């Protein structure tokens, strides 16, 4: 019924190829094709096809309690850009327990700027935070918790190995992060962001995206070792947040005068945003228990 309503509603729109659609729903579209439920897969494809009749299409989603951008490369709008799915972190974050969403992004909201038939610009805005807070940069060698980690705690986590929390809650790691700067950029995507490392004002190289889902192990350690959480919900892993580059000398803590620059180019609108960070997140600074 909802699909038929969408089709009939859009049938009333004239000159659709000259208009943008903002489609709001609760459950995410990304990865929602279901081989065991062909009607669900068919309906999802039909809904996405409806959106491609417009000049530009943005899908606004909640539900997950973490932020993620997902580009539907199989569904291209009349303006030539793919349907763009914005999965928003919750204003309440991890259910009002702290000032973080499940994957470590700040509690907050997104701000969008519309110009005619195009989403001209957008950013993720942490509640009470500067708009410039768009990333954290970590030392890929750091261990959190366990016998040797800092901050201390019962459960040990690292970027390379992940970790296991209470009741066997497992957080994956990625061995390729050893010796690397690791940037968590919660509004990033694989197509429209470029992340670079500079030292003494000169470019060192480009970051690559971590090739599969991992979690922010600093945030996960905070959830289990500081907040005392007990279930697997708090070891959430997500794609697309995490970028890495080998540090000169293999030890990010010893690199001097470095800066990470993350550049976002808005699809369709062409606006360019640049964000910078030159400080390692080595503890739970900025993480707050709000219960």
Report residues per predicted region.
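Metal-dependent phosphoesterase/phosphodiesterase active-site architecture
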Residues: 4-11, 74, 79-291
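His/acidic metal-ligating clusters that form di-metal
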Residues: 1-86
């Amino acid at each position: 019924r909802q699909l038929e309503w969408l089709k009939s509603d859009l049938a009333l729109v004239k000159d659709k190829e000259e208009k943008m659609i903002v489609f709001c729903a609760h459950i995410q579209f990304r990865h929602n094709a279901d081989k065991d439920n062909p009607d669900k897969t068919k309906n999802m494809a039909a809904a996405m096809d409806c959106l491609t009749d417009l000049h530009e299409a943005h899908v606004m989603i909640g539900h997950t309690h973490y932020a993620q951008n997902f580009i539907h490369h199989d569904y291209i709008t009349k303006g030539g850009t793919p349907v763009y799915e914005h999965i928003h972190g919750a204003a309440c974050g991890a259910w009002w327990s702290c000032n973080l969403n499940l994957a470590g992004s700040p509690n907050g909201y997104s701000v969008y700027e519309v110009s005619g038939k195009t989403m001209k610009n957008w950013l993720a805005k942490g509640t009470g935070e500067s708009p410039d807070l768009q990333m954290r940069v970590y030392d890929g060698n750091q261990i959190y918790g366990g016998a040797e980690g800092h901050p201390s705690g019962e459960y040990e986590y690292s970027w390379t190995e992940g970790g296991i929390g209470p009741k066997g809650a497992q957080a994956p790691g990625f061995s390729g992060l050893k010796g690397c700067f690791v940037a968590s950029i919660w509004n990033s995507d694989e197509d429209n962001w470029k992340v670079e490392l500079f030292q003494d004002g000169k470019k060192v190289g480009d970051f690559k995206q971590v090739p599969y889902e991992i979690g922010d192990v600093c945030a996960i350690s905070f959830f289990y070792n500081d907040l005392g959480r007990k279930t697997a919900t708090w070891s959430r892993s997500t794609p697309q947040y995490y970028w890495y580059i080998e540090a000169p000398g293999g030890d990010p803590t010893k690199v001097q005068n470095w800066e990470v620059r993350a550049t976002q180019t808005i699809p369709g609108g062409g606006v360019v945003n640049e964000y910078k960070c030159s400080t390692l997140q080595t503890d739970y600074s900025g993480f707050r228990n709000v219960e």
